[in-house]
């Protein structure tokens, strides 16, 4: 989202002065300001860029077999044979068709469409998959209580895997605060399932 230009007034990519994330975050922050809520914003892309995820990314890469086992055992789903707990950006800047071929701190080596490359874990040259990014963030941000929808709190859900991954990172997982889904009249339940 940080590299995608915000849409212009016609819905087309703009000149890139603002990115897609900023475009949709700004109205939300303005609405919060109207009710005197002033949150601390932690930009995920900037956090990767400044190296805040580097140590957790290193641990994830070094302990990729343990993380695979946690996810497969708790969630009950089998990960792809070439799965790796860090998704590097390929030569074209995307995550598509990128296969990790090795890891030696601070680099993850990869191949995309026959082109080989490496991504530095100290920079925003890739990211952790969401189920690993979430508990990684708990540790360095210092999260002590994490609210989430009941789907994330279900047996085998993302909190259950995140809790164990957090311990693998050497952190204490936050206390869970599970909430019910919100329903909008005529639209049914608003699920977070699409974000898993």
Regions found by a protein language model. Give the residues of each.
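Alpha-helical recognition segments enriched in aromatics with Gly/Pro capping
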Residues: 63-69, 73-194
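Intervening/peripheral non-core polypeptide segments
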Residues: 1, 194-196
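N-terminal Rossmann-like or analogous alpha/beta NTP/dinucleotide-binding catalytic cores
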Residues: 1-68, 162, 169
């Amino acid at each position: 989202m940080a590299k995608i230009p915000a849409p212009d007034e016609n819905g087309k990519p703009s000149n890139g002065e603002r990115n897609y994330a900023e475009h949709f975050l700004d109205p939300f922050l303005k609405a919060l300001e109207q009710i005197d809520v002033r949150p601390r914003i932690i930009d995920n892309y900037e956090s990767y860029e400044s190296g805040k995820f580097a140590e957790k990314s290193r641990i994830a890469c070094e302990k990729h077999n343990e993380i695979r086992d946690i996810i497969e055992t708790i969630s009950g789903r089998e990960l792809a044979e070439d799965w790796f707990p860090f998704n590097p950006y390929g030569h074209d800047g995307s995550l598509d068709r990128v296969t990790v071929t090795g890891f030696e701190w601070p680099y993850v080596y990869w191949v995309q469409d026959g082109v080989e490359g490496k991504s530095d874990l100290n920079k925003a040259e890739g990211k952790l998959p969401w189920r690993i990014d979430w508990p990684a963030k708990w540790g360095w941000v210092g999260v002590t209580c994490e609210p989430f929808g009941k789907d994330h709190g279900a047996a085998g859900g993302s909190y259950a895997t995140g809790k164990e991954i957090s311990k693998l990172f050497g952190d204490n997982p936050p206390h869970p605060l599970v909430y019910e889904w919100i329903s909008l009249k005529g639209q049914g339940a608003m699920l977070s399932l699409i974000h898993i």
